[in-house]
Amino acid sequence: MRKLIFITIMLCITGAFSARAQRYDRGFDLNSSTFVEKGTWMVGGKVGYSTHKNDNYRFLVIEDINSTGYRFTVSPMFCYMIRDNLGLGMRFGYGRNLLSIASANINIESVGINVKDYFSLSHDFSAMAVYRNYIPLGASKRFALFNEMQLAYGVGEAKIIDGHGTNIVGSFEKSHSLSLGINPGMIAFINDHVAVEFNVGMLGLQYSNVNQTHNQIYNGNRDATQINFKVNILSLGFGLAYYL
């Protein structure tokens, strides 16, 4: 009986080691095809602009919204391929956001809140180190997936004003942020050198600090840490890139 138990245990251990020793082949090798060659430079970027205007608009419990605003962003980038399908580079970003609310009313049962003459203007700058890995789709030289890891540092300023005439209150903010993010995407060449890229923010860790001065008298400070492990549909991005 002891011999039978011993033999059974040895067979289980041997089978486990044999299973681990065997490599399961799914039929593709990431190094079998070169999508972007070593020594290639990539220069690209993104530009975005959006604007809105509300005239007596209603959204859920917010009524009589009269507001205007816009958002402008630009993000140039360069990358050098240190190996086939593998590159290191830098990305820079600038954003400007303006929101002006002439009036808006919030009505929740018997509670009413009125917002009038609200103005906000903010600027933000960022610089990030980029590590990009291309994943060829078979032997295709036109389409591929890529994964971009970003380590970024950003600074920003914001001005907030509320009121009109002599009854005006205002705040000034300075912010600093440090983030680590993963942005997978897809690339498609439209000719030998120009490509269109699509990417989405999926994974991120961010720390931010905001220092606020209210009415040039009162000071406040806020620290925040955020971790995201999900697809962020608000960070969908399109861009153009030139490879040379």
Predicted regions mapped to residue ranges:
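Bacterial Sec-dependent N-terminal signal peptides
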Residues: M1-F28, L244
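Residues that define the transmembrane beta-barrel architecture of outer-membrane proteins
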Residues: G39-W41, T68-V74, F119-A127, F143, ...
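Predominantly the C-terminal beta-signal and adjacent terminal strand-loop region
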Residues: G185-L244
